[in-house]
Amino acid sequence: MEGLLTRCRTLSALATCSLRHSRCIVRKCYHCAPGRGQRLVVSRMFQPQNLREDQVLSLEGRASDLTCKSQRLMLQVGLILPASPGCYHLMPYTVRAVEKLVRVIDQEMQAIGGQKINMPSLSPAELWRATGRWDLMGRELLRLKDRHGKEYCLGPTHEEAVTALVASQKKLSYKQLPLLLYQVTRKFRDEPRPRFGLLRGREFYMKDMYTFDSSSEAAQETYSLVCDAYCRLFDRLGLRWMKARADVGSIGGTMSHEFQLPVDIGEDRLVVCPSCHFSANTEIVDLSQKICPDCQGPLTETKGIEVGHTFYLGTKYSSIFNAHFTNAHGESLLAEMGCYGLGVTRILAAAIEVLSTEDCIRWPSLLAPYQVCIIPPKKGSKEAAATEIVERLYDDVTEALPQLRGEVLLDDRTHLTIGNRLKDANKLGYPFVIIASKRALEDPAHFEVWSQNTGEVVFLTKEGVMELLTGVHVV
């Protein structure tokens, strides 16, 4: 028995030692300071880079030049990687930006009463045949059959599915209206010529909202409500936008507007009135007139990227699927509908397109994957003595400013010069880059702080850095 107890004590001691050793390994691997949280470091980020143009073209499956700034920059810094024509892998930085954009969208949609749902991407052919869009959509619709021969499509939009869903609720009351249902999911479209990276792909993320109202007047009020939410969204992102009258296209309805970001590579042609701010897609305007229909002033032409689209549908879909509600008098009436889309990945790429320089990505501040990058001195340099000071700064920032936890990266690639790491940070567009250069050895230490969105460079003490970062807003 005594021998057994001795062996148990030995095993316990070995286990404790092993556990301590593993903790040391983890701490070293993740750059953890004793008693501190895990530090996020650049060296551990999965970020394929430096693809040659011929590699990119081979991955995309077509021989054409990279003709779009956002596409070129996102490929160069490893934000996206082509999987097949029109389909991209989104790398960790990009996923973080998309998630932040979705949070902003959620805030705006839920502020007006939106309820988030999730509908299947596979949509039965009979729903689309009921509206005639199985044939109307033509080759853009990605179609498939299951093992039983049943036909489906990968939904580019969900008017049929959501109307059938609401119609299945036989006791829908006027008291539940307006009903605003939305989702953020992957959509699919068999683009004949996918190009411009995330701006025109075959698979993309989209926010689509569908509204159900008790009357035409109420539906148009809801239409205005959602449009106003879109305006606030783009204002929060710091983007210059236009709300342009547009064609209803294959979705149908009686009224439609596009939200456009003016930019030269845009594929949509728009006319704008400088006097009354009327704007419209040229698809619905007689260009030979060149006169504003609202104020009779002259129209100018520009190009834009469509990032949002709204439709007043009336009873186009509710009449087909019998989506009724019961009014205050017990009568069964057709719901008046609207649908509203936001291209999530397209907004991200379009924002990079309009905000970035030719060489460096610039994000809407709310969407930057990480808000701060801290660059310690190069190993073996004269400033290397400041390494501990800058690591302590990282810990102090993330502990004292809770909103920045998970938002600060430490560029631990100390085999590289500060200049090389600053160049990488500029390309990736962190809103703030903090460098431990020569003045970090002063008493008190001063850090070189780059504000990427303003171009300002200042030297601040730790207290100054903390005060500056206190004002950073994170979603």
Curated annotation (Swiss-Prot):
Mitochondrial aminoacyl-tRNA synthetase that catalyzes the specific attachment of the proline amino acid (aa) to the homologous transfer RNA (tRNA), further participating in protein synthesis. The reaction occurs in a two steps: proline is first activated by ATP to form Pro-AMP and then transferred to the acceptor end of tRNA(Pro). It comes from the Eukaryota. It is an enzyme of class 6 (ligase). It comes from Rattus norvegicus. Its main location: mitochondrion. One of its GO terms (cellular component) is mitochondrion. SUPFAM superfamilies: Class II aaRS ABD-related, Class II aaRS and biotin synthetases. GO terms for biological process: prolyl-tRNA aminoacylation. Belongs to the class-II aminoacyl-tRNA synthetase family. It catalyses: tRNA(Pro) + L-proline + ATP = L-prolyl-tRNA(Pro) + AMP + diphosphate. The keyword Nucleotide-binding applies. CDD domains: ProRS_anticodon_short, ProRS_core_prok. Its EC number is 6.1.1.15. It holds the Pfam family HGTP_anticodon. Gene3D superfamilies: Anticodon-binding domain, Bira Bifunctional Protein, Domain 2. The gene is Pars2. One of its GO terms (molecular function) is ATP binding. Residues 1-29 form a transit peptide. PANTHER family: MITOCHONDRIAL RIBOSOME PROTEIN L39/PROLYL-TRNA LIGASE FAMILY MEMBER, PROLINE--TRNA LIGASE, MITOCHONDRIAL-RELATED. This is Probable proline--tRNA ligase, mitochondrial. Keywords: Aminoacyl-tRNA synthetase, ATP-binding, Ligase, Mitochondrion, Nucleotide-binding, Protein biosynthesis, Transit peptide. It is found in: Mitochondrion matrix. Coiled coil: none annotated.
